[in-house]
Every structure is written in structure tokens, then in C-alpha cells.
């Protein structure tokens, strides 16, 4: 019963001053979550920076040597070919009976068959 009283009181107050009872709690919750997530995401970036800094000079040279040349046209056609291959794997030809009176390529009518 107490909950319903509070609910009706809150709804009435929210109609009178919506920013204080709706906007302010929303904005404060957004700011609270934002302030909590910044340190968490910063830890992730710090770890990544440490990994990059710890990469030795030999490993850097090895990565540079193994890098392949990238051509935009070649990549476009490679991706296009991959997509076509995926579509063709799912494709299956099925023969469908013709409707009566439907013409064929030879010019014969299927009525005669």
C-alpha cells in the first residue's frame, strides 16, 4: 500500500516539475555510470599500450617483413568472390513443373506433352 502511495505522489510531482523528478535522476545516473566506466576502460587501454611497448625490435621487423601489399581493387574482387562462393554453396537448382499453356523456350506448348 505504501508503494502505491509513493508511486502516485511521485507521478504527481513529476507532472509538476518533470526536470527535477525525471530528468535530474536520469542525468545523474548517466554521469555516475560514465564516471565508473572511464577507469575500467582506461585499464584496458593501459594494458594494450604496455603490450605494444614491450614488443621487441626484432618482432617489429618480423611483422614489417611479413606484411603483404594491399591493393584496393584486388581486395574488392577477393571479397566479392568470397561472397559469391558463399551464395553458390547455398544455391540448389530444382526443376519445377510448368503450368498448362505455359510456353517453353523451344516454342512448344506444354499442352502437347
Swiss-Prot record:
GO cellular component: mitochondrial inner membrane; mitochondrion
Record keywords, A-Z: Membrane, Mitochondrion, Mitochondrion inner membrane, Transit peptide, Transmembrane, Transmembrane helix
Transmembrane stretches, start-end: 20-40
Major localization listed first in the record, in broad terms: mitochondrion
Keyword Ribosomal protein listed: no
Keyword Nucleus part of the UniProt annotation: no
InterPro entries, A to Z: Cyt_c_Oxase_assmbl_COX16
Transit peptide: 1-12
Membrane topology: Single-pass membrane protein
Compartments it resides in: Mitochondrion inner membrane
GO biological process: mitochondrial cytochrome c oxidase assembly
Superkingdom of source: Eukaryota
Listed GO MF terms: copper chaperone activity
Biological role stated in the UniProt entry: Required for the assembly of the mitochondrial respiratory chain complex IV (CIV), also known as cytochrome c oxidase. May participate in merging the COX1 and COX2 assembly lines.
Family: Belongs to the COX16 family.
Protein name per Swiss-Prot or TrEMBL: Cytochrome c oxidase assembly protein cox16, mitochondrial
Organism: Schizosaccharomyces pombe (strain 972 / ATCC 24843) (Fission yeast)
Amino acid at each position: 500500500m505504501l508503494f502505491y502511495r509513493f508511486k502516485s505522489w511521485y507521478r504527481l510531482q513529476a507532472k509538476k516539475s518533470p526536470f527535477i523528478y525525471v530528468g535530474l535522476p536520469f542525468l545523474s545516473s548517466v554521469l555516475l555510470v560514465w564516471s565508473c566506466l572511464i577507469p575500467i576502460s582506461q585499464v584496458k587501454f593501459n594494458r594494450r599500450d604496455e603490450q605494444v611497448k614491450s614488443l621487441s625490435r626484432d618482432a617489429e621487423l618480423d611483422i614489417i617483413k611479413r606484411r603483404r601489399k594491399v591493393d584496393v581493387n584486388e581486395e574488392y574482387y577477393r571479397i566479392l568472390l568470397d561472397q559469391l562462393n558463399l551464395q553458390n554453396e547455398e544455391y540448389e537448382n530444382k526443376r519445377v513443373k510448368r503450368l498448362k499453356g505455359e510456353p517453353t523456350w523451344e516454342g512448344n506448348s506444354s499442352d502437347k506433352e
